[in-house]
Each structure stands twice: as C-alpha cells, then as structure tokens.
C-alpha cells in the first residue's frame, strides 16, 4: 500500500502537480512512518511549492532516519537555502559531501549556498532603514525614540530587527517599534493610542524644536556595544568549540599510539573548552578502560549519560556510554564474581540503541555468569550422591523423582556421562523421547567408549520405530565393546523389525503409521525425490534385467534398505 501511494506521488511530482505529490507522499508516510525515502520525496515536493519550513521539517526527519544517506543532506540544504539560511545550507551540503565527495547535486548545492551568501541582500525601505550605520544616531535624535531606548527590551527588539528586518512583522502592534520605523523612514505613522490632541501637539512642534533637543552622548554607543558583545560572545563560543575539536583529534591520535596519559590530557582540555559534546567524556572513558582504571571509566560514562540526557544528545551516544560502562563492570566482575550489574547496564544500553556489539557483550556477560555459577556449584562428591539417590528411585519405578536427582547430579558435575545415561533411561520410561535422545547423545559425546550411551540412544530410537537408525547406533557401540550383550540384543531386535517390514507383516494401521513417520525424515524425503532412485524403483517393478544390475550397486541397495525399513517399499 505504501509503495502504491509512493508511486502516485512520484507520478504527480513528475507531472508538476506538487500539491498532489505532497498528499500522496503523506498517505505513504502514514502507512510506513519509518521510510526515509518518503520524507525525502515529500521534502522535495514542499520545496517545489516554496513551502520551505515544511520542506525543512521533512528533510530533518530524513536525516534522523538515515544519517548516512547523502541525499538527505541535499534535501536539508535546499530547504535551508529556500529559507535564506545560507550558513545552515552550506553546513548541510558540506556534511553530505563528507559522505559522498563526488556527489554532483551536493556540489551544485554547495556552490549555490556560497553564491547566495556572498550576494548582497535585496534592498527594501525596511532593510535599508535598519541596516544603515546611523540607525542608532537617528533614533537618539528623536525625543520619543530616545526615551524608548532606555528600555533594554526595546533595544533588544531593535537589535533583532536590525539583524533580520523580516522580524519587523512580529512587532507591528508595538507602538515604540512603529514610531521608530517612522523616524527611520522619515514618515509620520499614527498609532492607535494617540488621541487628536496628541496629533495637534505633534503638528505644532517645529523642526527647529526637534533639532534643538540635547543629544545624549552614550545611549546609541551602549546599544551598539550590546550588539557587538553578543556577536563577540558567539564568536568566542565557536572558537572554543573549534579548539575543543582539535584537542579531541589530538587525543584520538595519542590513544592510537597507546599514549594514554597524553590522550586523557587532551580529552580533559576539550571538556574544559566545550561541555556540550559528550564524546569527550566517552573517549576519555575508553582510555581509562584500556588503562584498567574501571572506576574512573564508570564515572565518566555516568556523567556522559546524565549530560547527554540534559542536552538531548543522540541516543546512540548515550548507548555508547552505557555499553562502555557495562564493559568496565564486566571486567570488574572477573574479580568481584558479580556479572549482574554489567548485564543490567548492557540491557539498558540496548533499549537506547540495539547495537550488535552491545548485544555480543551482553551474551558474553550472561555466559560468563552462567559458567561462574556452574563453577561455584561444581562438586563431584555431591554429584555422585545425587546420582545414587536417582538410581534408588529408578529401581522403585519413581521416574519423575529419579529424573530430578539425575538433573541435580548433572548440575554438580556436568562432565558425568553416567548421570546423562541414567537420565536418558528415565526420559525413555516417561515417554519423553526427544529429551532422552539428547541426553544419550550427550553421554556419548562425553565418553565415546561408554557402551551405555549407545544402548540408551538405540533404545530411544527403537521406541520411536526408527529401526535402521537404532541398528546403526548399536553397531557403532559394538566397535567399542564387541561382546556387549545388550548391544547384540538390540541389533537382533532391529533386524527382526526390519525383516518384518520387508515381508510386509505389519498391519495396515502399523504400516500407515510407519510411512507417515518416515515421510518426516529428511533422508527418506531426499531418496524419494532423487530422479535416479525413482527410476530404480520403477525398474524393480517393470524391468527385472535392469533390477539385477541395480542390486549389484551397494549405494543403491543401501537406499532401498532404508525405504524398506521405513515401510515405504515392501519386497514380495
């Protein structure tokens, strides 16, 4: 559905119907709100309609969803350019070019932003009035305006309008601003709060009287100084941030050289210059981590998380700080033997950003915790006692109770093959065949020479009517214990069942059950889907001479035997 709406939007955009394109892209976004391409397309449509504020919002959303996509910054730059924010447009295009230095659209946009920034602003009476060098002097020369300049709020308003004449529209209801524009444009602007007597009085004032008013010596200079101080403060902030970045780069270089003390010095200096970038804290934490100063690392990470939330920093940065803290806690846990705090922090980091590296560290911490618990619980003597209790209960046919004791024995000694063997026997008695098979295989894995493992596994497979597999298991066991009577009896029982199948001695119900079970076996499925075996089976029915040749092929006969054992094929 979202793709359909997107296609309609693209078609409308191509046809020049940008309003319709916006509607279609909005419909698509409602269906797929995390699709960055849809926001990008709608941003372009808004920009084509000269709705640059909406275009900017969509472009910013595109960047948030896909920060590594160069086109997102092309959209962002175009929106800023439409709003005449040349510096922001320049920054957006530069960021995009860092991702894709050869992108023609970004290069063109950057050139447009540079040209627009250097182009003189369009002249208008308001722009000229507010940008003139004598603005403050002319206002001071007027008695009413001079009185208004005593109010810092009014001075701030006039400074804002001087920086951006378009802000004049925000203050149309302010009598002081209207009077000031009248003074600067040399026109008479009547304000609603003046009554007729005021107009008459103003009309009676002569030009000489206006000129003869004493001019203050300091008010305009003070206003200009305020503006200059603010600009100087902004410049100083930019300079400090730039110096902080240089310190960070120097710290990174020292870190790569394993010069940790120097790296810490640079990161600390960066923090002094700019406390609004938490990467300085996380980088210093990384150095402390390498040095084994885990407590210092944790402190920096906690500061980074706290400061990051205050600044509403990127959630990825906060997640990075949490992951680094978790790593320090995990390393400390090797001594403290408490992995729970590290696990908790890793889980918290994953809620901020599901990062594969963090997930890997969480799994490692959980595994280490489990291994530690097993080490602390390990006691072969208690394991033997639990196994003996299980044996007594097994003899009493109390299989569920016996299973619990065998499980306890395994926890106490995970390497005890006998405990797995005995629990497999319990599971078989209880009809829990998959669990019994798993324990029997674990028993064989721990001790391949232990014949009980093979008898347990064979018994489970025999109970599951997988006679050919049980036969293979018993034969494998005989390799380690050739005279084991239990294994020999198992082989005899399997052969009887296989012969019974080949003679077709099963009841229809038994045959149907065996065939249904066999069809679930991937090996049986593979044999039946093999074109060569399909032809072989056909030859056995229709071409006796060809069948004689097939009988000489051991691989073919092995597969035929599997089908016979499964009840799929019967020999008559």
Curated annotation (Swiss-Prot):
Induction: By heat shock, heat, cold shock and wounding. A motif (Bipartite nuclear localization signal) lies at residues 241-258. Keywords: Acetylation, Chaperone, Cytoplasm, Nucleus, Phosphoprotein, Repeat, Stress response, TPR repeat. Residues 198-210 have a biased composition (Acidic residues). Residues 142-181, 521-560 form the STI1 domain. The keyword Cytoplasm applies. SMART domains: STI1, TPR. GO terms for molecular function: Hsp90 protein binding; preprotein binding. It comes from the Eukaryota. GO terms for biological process: cellular response to cold; cellular response to heat; chaperone-mediated protein complex assembly; response to heat; response to unfolded protein; response to wounding. Its main location: cytoplasm. Co-chaperone that forms a complex with HSP70 and HSP90 and preproteins (e.g. chloroplast preproteins). Interacts with HSP90. The tetratricopeptide repeat (TPR) domain, forming a carboxylate clamp (CC), mediates interaction with the highly conserved 'EEVD' motif at the C-terminal ends of HSP90 and HSP70. Mediates nuclear encoded chloroplast preproteins binding to HSP90 prior to chloroplastic sorting. Mediates the association of the molecular chaperones HSP70 and HSP90. This is Hsp70-Hsp90 organizing protein 1. It comes from Glycine max (Soybean). The gene is HOP1.
């Amino acid at each position: 559905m979202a793709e359909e709406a997107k296609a309609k939007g693209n078609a409308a955009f191509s046809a020049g119907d940008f309003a319709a394109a916006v509607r279609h892209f909005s419909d698509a976004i409602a269906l797929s709100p995390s699709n960055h391409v849809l926001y990008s397309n709608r941003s372009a449509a808004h920009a084509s309609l000269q709705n640059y504020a909406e275009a900017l919002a969509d472009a910013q959303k595109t960047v948030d969803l896909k920060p590594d996509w160069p086109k997102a910054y092309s959209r962002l730059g175009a929106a800023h350019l439409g709003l005449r924010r040349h510096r922001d447009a320049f920054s957006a295009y530069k960021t995009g070019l860092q991702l894709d230095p050869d992108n023609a659209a970004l290069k063109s946009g950057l050139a447009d932003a540079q040209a627009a920034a250097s182009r003189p602003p369009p002249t208008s009476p308001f722009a000229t009035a507010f940008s003139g060098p004598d603005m403050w002097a002319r206002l001071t020369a007027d008695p009413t305006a001079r009185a208004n300049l005593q109010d810092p709020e009014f001075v701030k308003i006039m400074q804002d309008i001087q920086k951006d004449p378009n802000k004049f529209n925000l203050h149309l209801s302010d009598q002081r601003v209207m009077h000031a524009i009248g003074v600067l444009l040399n026109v008479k602007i009547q304000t609603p709060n003046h009554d007729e007597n005021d107009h008459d009085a103003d009309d009676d004032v002569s030009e000489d009287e206006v000129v003869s008013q004493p001019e203050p010596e300091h008010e305009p200079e003070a206003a200009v100084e305020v503006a200059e101080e603010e600009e100087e403060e902004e410049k100083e902030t930019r300079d400090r941030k730039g110096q902080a970045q240089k310190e960070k780069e120097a710290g990174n270089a020292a870190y790569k050289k394993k010069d940790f003390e120097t790296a810490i010095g640079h990161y600390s200096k960066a923090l002094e210059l700019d406390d609004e970038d938490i990467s300085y804290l996380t980088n210093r934490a990384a150095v402390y981590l390498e040095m084994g100063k885990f407590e210092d690392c944790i402190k920096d990470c906690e500061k980074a998380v706290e400061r990051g939330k205050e600044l509403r920093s990127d959630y990825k940065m906060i997640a990075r700080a949490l992951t680094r803290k978790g790593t320090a806690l995990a390393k400390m846990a090797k001594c403290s033997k408490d992995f729970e705090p590290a696990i908790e922090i890793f889980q918290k980091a994953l809620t901020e950003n599901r990062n594969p590296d963090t997930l890997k560290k969480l799994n490692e911490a959980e595994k280490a915790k489990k291994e530690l618990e097993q080490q602390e619980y390990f006691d072969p003597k208690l394991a033997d006692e639990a196994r003996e209790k299980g044996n007594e209960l097994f003899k009493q046919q109390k299989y569920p109770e016996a299973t619990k004791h065998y499980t306890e024995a395994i926890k106490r000694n995970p390497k005890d093959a006998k405990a797995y063997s005995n629990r497999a026997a319990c599971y078989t008695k209880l009809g829990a065949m998959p669990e019994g098979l798993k324990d029997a295989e674990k028993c064989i894995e721990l001790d391949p020479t232990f014949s009980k493992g093979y008898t347990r596994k064979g018994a489970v497979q025999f109970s599951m009517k997988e006679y050919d597999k049980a036969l293979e298991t018993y034969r494998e066991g005989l390799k380690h214990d050739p005279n084991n009577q239990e294994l020999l009896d198992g082989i005899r029982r399997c052969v009887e069942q296989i012969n019974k199948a080949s003679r077709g001695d099963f009841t229809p119900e038994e045959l149907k059950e065996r065939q249904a079970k066999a069809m679930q076996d991937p090996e049986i499925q593979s044999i039946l889907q093999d074109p060569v075996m399909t032809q072989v089976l056909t030859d056995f029915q229709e071409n006796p001479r060809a069948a004689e040749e097939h009988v000489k092929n051991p691989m073919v006969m092995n597969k035929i035997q599997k089908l016979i054992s499964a009840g799929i094929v019967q020999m008559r």
